[in-house]
């Protein structure tokens, strides 16, 4: 019988049971507990120690942009090869010359022609990955799937991460049925469906309040036949977001505690979900208590949490609590935005 692998020493079957129980409780109480209800391509920073004659990633991107815009795709191919040799990997701007204009179709066909001619291995695979991500950004999902087929036929290293931008785009647009068909396509090529792939579905359902579908996604994660799968930080972030959107602060807090018990790092955004719902629900004192419970561990987190809370309190005219938070920020030497700094000077320092 399949079991989820414990992250540390906690049986994550219990975790999933807890999360599904929240769904059941939400349905029984007529609340929609939506909590169970980058792969992005980062720009590689230029090497600061590079010799003066060595090109940077930005320079390679600019050269590829000029070559692609002028229709010189042999130059594009050479640049794709040479940039990897020089440790200047592809970025989100590499295929920026490809846009939704009249030249789109011909440019894409030229790219399909030259990509199989790039250096075999990482260079070729990553070029396909980067182009697929670009097509998804342009909303050209069908063309992205054509490239997937090209990779499969050519045996160019088709892998799970290649599908991530497609699944991300489809689920964000609530094209769930299409996204599941992409999952079936992955399986047809013997490509494993990883936790990130499932997270795209889970986030979409939690955001929309589809309790039943989110619960089904969790079950699919448990039953995944490719191997042991554990929820990750993004999984729990989606669950906390869903709980907060349904007004279930206690459920969000329970999930947050579960993350800490299992040793998972908590995203700044996850804290923001909880803070926002507490203020929205009128739990002002509790929101202050919540941010203070995490204060002192991470300066940037403190700036995000305390600053966000202060802004929300001021917007709701909860000036007493806002002053308390701003005093704490001042004592801790935390950075304030212009609006908060002005409020602090007028209402805290001069009071």
Curated annotation (Swiss-Prot):
Keywords: Mitochondrion, Repeat, Transit peptide. InterPro entries: Pentatricopeptide_rpt, TPR-like_helical_dom_sf. Coiled coil: none annotated. It is found in: Mitochondrion. GO terms for cellular component: mitochondrion. The keyword Aminoacyl-tRNA synthetase does not apply. Belongs to the PPR family. P subfamily. This is Pentatricopeptide repeat-containing protein At3g56030, mitochondrial. It comes from Arabidopsis thaliana.
């Amino acid at each position: 019988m399949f079991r989820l692998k414990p992250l540390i020493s906690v049986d994550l079957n219990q975790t999933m049971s807890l999360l599904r129980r929240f769904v059941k409780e939400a349905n029984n109480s007529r609340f929609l507990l939506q909590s169970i209800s980058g792969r992005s391509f980062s720009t590689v920073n230029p090497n600061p120690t590079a010799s003066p004659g060595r090109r940077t990633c930005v320079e390679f991107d600019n050269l590829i942009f000029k070559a692609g815009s002028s229709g010189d795709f042999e130059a594009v191919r050479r640049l794709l090869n040479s940039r990897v040799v020089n440790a200047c990997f592809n970025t989100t701007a590499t295929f920026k010359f490809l846009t939704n204009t009249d030249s789109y179709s011909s440019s894409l066909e030229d790219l399909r022609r030259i990509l199989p001619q790039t250096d075999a291995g990482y260079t070729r695979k990553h070029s396909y990955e980067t182009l697929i991500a670009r097509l998804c950004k342009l909303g050209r999902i069908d063309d992205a799937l054509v490239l997937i087929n090209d990779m499969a036929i050519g045996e160019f290293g088709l892998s799970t991460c290649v599908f991530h931008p497609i699944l991300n785009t489809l689920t964000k647009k609530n094209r769930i049925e299409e996204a599941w068909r992409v999952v079936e396509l992955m399986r047809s090529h013997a490509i494993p469906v990883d936790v990130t792939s499932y997270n795209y579905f889970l986030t979409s359902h939690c955001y929309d309040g589809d309790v039943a579908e989110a619960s089904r996604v969790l079950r699919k994660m448990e039953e995944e036949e490719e191997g042991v799968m554990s929820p990750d930080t993004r999984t729990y972030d989606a669950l906390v977001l869903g709980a907060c959107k349904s007004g279930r602060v206690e459920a969000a807090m329970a999930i947050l505690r579960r993350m800490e018990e299992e040793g998972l790092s908590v995203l700044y955004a996850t804290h923001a979900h909880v803070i926002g719902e507490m203020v929205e629900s009128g739990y002002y004192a509790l929101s202050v208590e919540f941010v203070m419970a995490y204060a002192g561990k991470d300066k940037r987190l403190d700036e995000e949490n305390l600053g966000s809370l202060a802004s929300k309190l001021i917007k709701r005219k909860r000036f007493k609590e806002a002053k308390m938070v701003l005093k704490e920020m001042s004592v801790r030497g935390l950075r304030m935005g212009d609006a908060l700094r002005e409020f602090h000077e007028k209402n805290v320092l001069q009071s």
